[in-house]
Each structure stands twice: as structure tokens, then as C-alpha cells.
Design a protein with these regions (language model features):
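Structured binding/interaction patches within domain cores
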Residues: 12-204
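Eukaryotic low-complexity, non-globular regulatory regions
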Residues: 211-220
Length: 222
């Protein structure tokens, strides 16, 4: 995220104003848990996060739900309960936002939870007893959603999977896509990184590959 702040013309920071806070959190976690060898593949995604902002709670809910659904089938048992609760919490928030019955789940959420039946049953009991303060929009944005994406990234990094770096990159890519679907992009930041600024940023942090795209959404997500 320090790269993004520099390219956006902000001060050097891992919490840039140019990026939605939860998307920035996903990017930080993915970067922290990715190996040195895998980190270079993240650099090409940096311009994609610049200018993606917005206050719509759908952004938080969609990023968190996608993160939980990706990680839940592969994480250790002790983290499955946390992420199963995360899936149900996100679904409940989306039900409120979209005006659908609370308790109704999207097909992908149902199929994901079906892979971890014991954790899903525990999560259903836990969420049914949750007080109103824990289900509020304020609590979801400030505490629940950040906790979900953190546990998803940590769980993937520690999971027994063939390519944790690849899964972490997917976590970030789908968070970018979820944010882009609901956020507005700042038109002042929509022209892509200035080549000179990008080159300076690469030199400053050790030489990530130079971007040669004209727009953030023109990135090839391999």
C-alpha cells in the first residue's frame, strides 16, 4: 500500500486515502503473508487499488464474504469456526442491505459451508445468539469485516495447500473486483501510474517490475 500512496501522490503510507480501508487491509495482509518469491507478482496489481473508494457497506460485506468463502475450505479446524461465522455475518448484513430475508444464503455460501458441516453448525448456533450490538453496521465495518479478512489471509498462509501464494493473490484480486463493483473510482486517479513515479517507487523499494499500462483496469491478472 505504500506503493499505492506514492503513485497516488499522497504521503508514504500503508493506509492511503486513495483506497477503500478494507481493500487496503486485504492488500497489507496478502503482502505480509506472501513469500519473497511470490511478492513480485503482487506488484502488477498495485495500480488497480488506486482510486477505489466509497462508503457503501456492500463493499465491506462483499470483500469480507469473498475472503471467507475462499479461505474456509482450506484453513485449519480452529479457524473454520471463525470464518464460518464470518460467512453468516456477511450474509446477514447483505440481507439487510438488499432487503432479503435474514437467514437466506447465496448458493456459493451454502456450498462452502456444506464442506465444513461441524463448523457451519457451530456458527449457526453462535450467530443466532449474537446480541444486536454485534450485528450492527458500525460493528461490522469496524470490527467484523477486518477480522474476517485477517483470518482469511492468515488461514490461507498457514494452510496445507500446494500454492498459498497463489491463493493469497486470488484473495487480493477478488477483493479488488468486489470493491470495483460497488465503489466509485476517483477520475483524477484513473489515468494509471505516471511512469517516472512508478520507476522511482521501484527504485525506492528494491526494483519491482515497471508497469506499462495506461489504466488500472487494463492490468492483466494472470
Amino acid at each position: 500500500m505504500e506503493f499505492a500512496s506514492l503513485l497516488a501522490g499522497e504521503r508514504w503510507s500503508d493506509h492511503p486515502a486513495c483506497t477503500h480501508p478494507l481493500l487496503a487491509a486485504v492488500a497489507r495482509h496478502v503482502n505480509d503473508y506472501t513469500s519473497d518469491a511470490g511478492r513480485a507478482r503482487l506488484a502488477e496489481l498495485i495500480p488497480s487499488v488506486i482510486g477505489l473508494t466509497g462508503d457503501d457497506l456492500h463493499i465491506d460485506a462483499r470483500i469480507a464474504l469473498g475472503s471467507a468463502r475462499l479461505a474456509l475450505p482450506v484453513v485449519a479446524a480452529d479457524r473454520q469456526r471463525v470464518l464460518a461465522v464470518g460467512v453468516l455475518s456477511c450474509e446477514r448484513m447483505l440481507a439487510v442491505l438488499d432487503g432479503r430475508p435474514v437467514g437466506a444464503l447465496e448458493e456459493q455460501s451454502r456450498s462452502t459451508l456444506a464442506q465444513v458441516p461441524h463448523a457451519a453448525a457451530w456458527a449457526a448456533r453462535f450467530t443466532s445468539a449474537a446480541p444486536a450490538s454485534v450485528t450492527s453496521a458500525k460493528h461490522f465495518r469496524r470490527q467484523a469485516a477486518p477480522s474476517i479478512v485477517r483470518n482469511a489471509a492468515q488461514g490461507i498462509a498457514q494452510a496445507c495447500v500446494p500454492d498459498p501464494d497463489g491463493m493469497l493473490r486470488t484473495l487480493l484480486v477478488q477483493a479488488i473486483d468486489a470493491c470495483a463493483a460497488w465503489a466509485h473510482r476517483d477520475p483524477n486517479l484513473d489515468a494509471g501510474p505516471d511512469p517516472a513515479v512508478w520507476a522511482a517507487a521501484c527504485r525506492r523499494t528494491g526494483g519491482f517490475p515497471i508497469m506499462e499500462t495506461t489504466r488500472p483496469d487494463a492490468l492483466a491478472r494472470r
